[in-house]
Amino acid sequence: MVIDASVVLAWLQDAPGSDMAERHMVEGVIGAANWSEVLQKARQHGAQPGLVARLLTSFGLQVVDVTAEDGERAADLWAAGSVLSLADRLCLALGLRLGLAVVTTDHAWRSIAHGPEVIVAR
């Protein structure tokens, strides 16, 4: 399963969906762009990114590099007026490349055409 940054952040903040997040982090993957987003938010809220990184990887969460193919698919997922950020589209593109479902807390992802299976954690 590909884990969106929103799911990891929900777990770190013990927000709704955090129980589901922990289950998926055990064998999940997160793209490098979303990994950066998680660590940036940790820093923004006063946490030590290195400590957060070690905690998350101790669950078995694997960080996967973004590829040129992911970049091309993310561009294909763009649509005028879309609420999807570049990091969102890269997460979806990673799911497509790996043939895995993507878990997020963002309900808007369910309406993405030509994307991977989306599971909403809340």
Regions from the language model: what does each represent?
Residues 3-4, 30-33, 84-86, 106-107, ...:
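Histidine- and aromatic-rich ligand-binding microenvironments
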Residues 57-81:
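Acidic catalytic patch
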Residues 1-30, 42-54, 122:
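Short, well-structured N-terminal submotif of metal-dependent ribonuclease cores
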Residues 92, 96-122:
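Acidic, PIN/NYN-like endoribonuclease modules and their adjacent C-terminal/linker elements
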Residues 25-26, 60, 99:
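Residue-level detector of structured alpha->beta connecting loops
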Residues 7-8, 34, 70, 90-91, ...:
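Alpha-helix capping/helix-boundary segments
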